[in-house]
UniProtKB/Swiss-Prot annotation:
Signal peptide: none annotated. PROSITE patterns: PGM_PMM. This is Phosphoglucosamine mutase. Activated by phosphorylation. Keywords: Isomerase, Magnesium, Metal-binding, Phosphoprotein. Binds 1 Mg(2+) ion per subunit. GO terms for molecular function: magnesium ion binding; phosphoglucosamine mutase activity; phosphomannomutase activity. InterPro entries: A-D-PHexomutase_a/b/a-I (IPR005844), A-D-PHexomutase_a/b/a-I/II/III (IPR016055), A-D-PHexomutase_a/b/a-II (IPR005845), A-D-PHexomutase_a/b/a-III (IPR005846), A-D-PHexomutase_C (IPR005843), A-D-PHexomutase_C_sf (IPR036900), A-D-PHexomutase_CS (IPR016066), Alpha-D-phosphohexomutase_SF (IPR005841). The keyword Isomerase applies. It comes from Klebsiella pneumoniae subsp. pneumoniae (strain ATCC 700721 / MGH 78578). Belongs to the phosphohexose mutase family. Its EC number is 5.4.2.10. Mg(2+) binds at residues 102, 241, 243, 245.
Amino acid sequence: MSNRKYFGTDGIRGRVGDAPITPEFVLKLGWAAGKVLARHGSRKIIIGKDTRISGYMLESALEAGLAAAGLSASFTGPMPTPAIAYLTRAFRAEAGIVISASHNPFYDNGIKFFSIEGTKLPDDVEEAIEAEMEKELTCVDSAELGKASRIVDAAGRYIEFCKGTFPNELSLGTLKVVVDCAHGATYHIAPNVFRELGAQVIAMGCEPDGLNINEEVGATDVRALQARVLAEKADLGIAYDGDGDRVIMVDHEGNKVDGDQILYIIAREGLRQGQLRGGAVGTLMSNMGLELALKQLGIPFARAKVGDRYVLEMLQEKGWRIGAENSGHVILLDKTTTGDGIVASLQVVAAMVRNHMSLHDLCSGMKMFPQLLVNVRFTEGSGNPLENEHVKAVTAEVEAALGKRGRVLLRKSGTEPLIRVMVEGEHEDQVHEFAHRIAEAVKSV
């Protein structure tokens, strides 16, 4: 069991100005990471960020800490998280660092690391960084201080990488696409990718001001996108989250297409093209409809713990290549090393064009079970609600009522003080009743 103090399932995250997301902490983190990473020989780190106003402050603090440890930093400016993973590999940097809180509001921020391979740092490296944090900060000699530079063509490099994952023989010239960038890091990337591939692009959520990231736009709130798709009579809509590692889509009828459905489409297309290796990995939150639909196609399916790092770990264990969370993290190891919203959406659009099918029709082979997720906030330090006997008893009653045609999942968020209550079954009314019954039990603790 890990004893990590700061690193959660997706790096270090919190409210800006509150520990640990303070300038002092981030400077010390940069120094500690620099000391650990310098042991591997390289002296170059790539740093990117999303569009939050606090990114500039935290970027400066990180750079100061790295420089004090003797490591140089190359800055990309606002860039999607998967772009930093790609650029870290492309530049053979020792690590990449992203300053982002992904889908969270602007007042949150976080720090996430990528290894030289473009994957998230192993637990033992994160633990080594935390151990270094306990030491007194020292500065290398002036002649050995790290330097700062800017990668001026970072956006162009990543745009070309994304386009390179789309089949050369296909064109998007017939498609009208609404692209919602959540006022986040994809705002200057995604619309250009789709335009350069020939699509008619209607861009929204592309006016970041440092405060509006994820605000009623993007992958976590597709209502505006759904309305825009219908108003523009577009073929589809694509929504990314603030740092571009998630994607949710909308069909021409305004229906939401989530990560489970995206995984189904990509897996089925891989099977049709003879390119599917093994099976597909989802999570404990993946819809039962996905599992049943893949089973009908003869595609093996496995569930990992919630979190894209655990999806990746299971893919590596099994030697499979595709996995996703229903929240829209889609990992395609033949093309990327981490969840990449733009690359995933390109594979879905390629399936549409190749098969002359709408997004709605591509989803038709998978019947979604009604599923409800209720988030219940709890007070940290007051104990674990999941260990409460009343909560356990209510959960057991619901599981007995659902039988084999439904599921209950309770888990603590890895990034926020929340208990996530998920209930899934054949009947929507029953699912809602059971989910709220368990949620009330959690609230009563």
